[in-house]
């Protein structure tokens, strides 16, 4: 099979995407496929037309590869591709929209507030007061369309609030403030289309105190514990919520649903990643291995799902 792996691109997660794409390409080549890697740039359409792949493996993290833009391009070109379609990609890339959909459906997610940069510029005092009154401290400030915790800040003192908001607005035109919940962080990898399978849950323990970009991608700075050290009923609830969230948002192929387990008892969805990392330290490959799928088998399964009608 001829497979083009899209990777790199202009996003803040470029380096991770290059690692994911390289790992995927190596696995596919090892399975006997004819594979090329394409760094997303203005030549992408010409290269895709010239190679004429049977399927495109999207290993792009962040915009424009994860927000529906590249998905729309591939739809126009008539090329099958891995992962979620345009609408699901656009919604899951935007944490604000994701949370609004989750709340409408009654899926638990931490309380949040959101503003545009323009609103903040003319109402800083009122907005900061609203955050402190409604959410208190500590509070999490996020750039809503970034991944890998880029543009995410935990604010523990009032004086840190304004710099955190400014930091988030460096990446996006809006920002969100989210209630800080104390509890274990767990994640659920989900695989499938019409009948998605939730893979074994993983508890994430960061040795830096916060599962940030460095902790995610530096070997030895975090532990992935399977199964999480939580009661069976809590794990069952998280598994059910992961499947519901995946279906609600219209995800396809594979995705990752991240949770904070408030007080060690109440799983709450914090975000959904529609193009999860596929590097040596990534969570989805770890979950797949726990389910009996080695990395090449996982990659092949994702390709097979892309070709399903």
From Swiss-Prot:
- Tell me a GO biological process for this protein: regulation of cell shape
Annotated residues that bind Mg(2+) 2 are located at 271, 273
Per its UniProt record, the required cofactor names are:
Mg(2+); Mn(2+)
Q: Cellular component per GO?
A: cytoplasm
* Binding residue positions for Mg(2+) 1: 258, 271
Please list the residue ranges annotated as the ATP-grasp domain.
Answer: 99-304
The record, for InterPro entries, names: ATP-grasp, ATP_grasp_subdomain_1, D-Ala_lig_Van_CS, D_ala_D_ala, Dala_Dala_lig_C, Dala_Dala_lig_N, PreATP-grasp_dom_sf
Molecular function terms from GO: ATP binding; D-alanine-D-alanine ligase activity; metal ion binding
An example of a Pfam family matching this protein is Dala_Dala_lig_C
Q: Which reaction does it catalyse?
A: 2 D-alanine + ATP = D-alanyl-D-alanine + ADP + phosphate + H(+)
Family that this chain belongs to: Belongs to the D-alanine--D-alanine ligase family.
Q: Which NCBIfam families match?
A: D_ala_D_alaTIGR, PRK01372.1
In UniProt terms, what function does this protein have? Answer: Cell wall formation.
Q: What is this protein called?
A: D-alanine--D-alanine ligase
What species is given as this protein's source? Moorella thermoacetica (strain ATCC 39073 / JCM 9320)
At the highest ranks, the source species' classification is:
Bacteria, Bacillati, Bacillota, Clostridia, Moorellales
């Amino acid at each position: 099979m001829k497979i083009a792996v899209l990777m790199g691109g202009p996003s803040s997660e470029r380096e991770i995407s290059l690692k994911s794409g390289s790992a995927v390409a190596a696995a596919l080549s090892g399975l006997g496929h004819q594979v090329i890697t394409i760094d997303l740039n203005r030549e992408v359409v010409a290269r895709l037309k010239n190679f004429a792949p049977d399927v495109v493996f999207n290993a792009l993290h962040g915009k424009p590869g994860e927000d529906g833009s590249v998905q729309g391009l591939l739809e126009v070109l008539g090329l099958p591709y891995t992962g979620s379609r345009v609408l699901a990609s656009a919604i899951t890339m935007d944490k604000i929209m994701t949370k609004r959909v989750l709340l409408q459906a009654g899926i638990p997610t931490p309380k949040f507030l959101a503003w545009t940069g323009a609103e903040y510029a003319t109402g800083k005092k009122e907005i900061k007061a609203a955050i402190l009154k409604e959410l208190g401290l500590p509070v999490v400030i996020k750039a809503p369309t970034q991944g890998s915790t880029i543009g995410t800040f935990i604010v523990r003192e009032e004086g840190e609030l304004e710099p955190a908001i400014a930091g988030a607005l460096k990446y996006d035109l809006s920002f969100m403030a989210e209630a800080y919940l104390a509890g274990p962080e767990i994640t659920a990898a989900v695989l499938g289309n019409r009948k998605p399978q939730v893979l074994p849950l993983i508890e994430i323990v960061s040795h830096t105190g916060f599962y940030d970009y460095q902790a995610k991608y530096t070997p030895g700075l975090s532990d992935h514990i399977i199964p999480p050290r939580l009661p069976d009923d809590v794990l069952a609830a998280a598994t059910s919520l992961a499947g519901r969230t995946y279906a609600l948002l219209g995800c396809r192929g594979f995705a990752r649903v991240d949770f904070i387990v408030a007080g060690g008892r109440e799983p709450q969805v914090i975000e959904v990643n529609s193009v999860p990392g596929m590097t040596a330290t990534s969570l989805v490959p770890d979950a797949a291995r726990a389910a009996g799928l080695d990395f090449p088998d996982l990659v092949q399964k994702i390709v097979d799902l892309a070709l399903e009608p």
